[in-house]
């Protein structure tokens, strides 16, 4: 296939700010104007998961984006109680991921993307349902960003009202600090 000097670039199938096209027909329809070729397989993909991005810092890999190959492996929360209620933390609007906790375990979602895109928002909601199903979780508390106009905040408000769940608002800088503490076993 390759001739000397040929360069192939292969990447996940999506345009900027759109969810990955994980069905062959969808990819060929949405991307035919920008892709030279499609490498497909007869093994069906059940769930879209974007690429992980890591960087080597101080000789060790560090996540810039924890996704394919690393999720949904949990992060152990050092300070969490075994009987703590299940919490769904809905994430921000840009570069969204969400987190579901179960006792001392935090299950981070894959990178979902920017929720302003309607298809990405629909994917976000589908992935939440998927996580709740595969981990047999039913949130007892929702947490969302303090920003009132974020679509993830709107999702949390609507779901809390619909299901009668308590809702906690979190300033996003606080959420960032908490996630770094958890990643390093300090939360």
Q: PLM features: residue spans?
A:
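Acidic, glycine-enriched active-site microenvironments
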Residues: 1-187
């Amino acid at each position: 296939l390759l001739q000397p000097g040929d360069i192939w670039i292969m990447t996940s199938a999506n345009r900027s700010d759109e969810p990955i096209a994980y069905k062959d027909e969808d990819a060929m329809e949405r991307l035919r104007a920008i892709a030279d070729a499609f490498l497909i397989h007869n093994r069906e993909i059940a769930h879209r998961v974007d690429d992980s991005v890591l960087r080597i810092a101080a000789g060790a890999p560090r996540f810039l984006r924890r996704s394919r190959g690393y999720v949904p492996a949990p992060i152990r929360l050092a300070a969490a109680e075994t009987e703590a209620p299940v919490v769904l933390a809905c994430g921000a609007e840009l570069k969204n991921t969400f987190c579901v906790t179960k006792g001392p375990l935090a299950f981070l979602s894959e990178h979902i993307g920017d929720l302003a895109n309607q298809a990405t928002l629909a994917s976000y909601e589908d992935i939440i349902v998927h996580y709740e199903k595969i981990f047999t979780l039913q949130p007892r508390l929702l947490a969302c960003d303090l920003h009132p106009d974020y679509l993830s905040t709107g999702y949390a408000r609507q779901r809390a009202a619909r299901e009668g769940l308590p809702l906690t608002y979190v300033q996003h800088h606080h959420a960032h600090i908490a996630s770094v503490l958890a990643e390093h076993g300090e939360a």
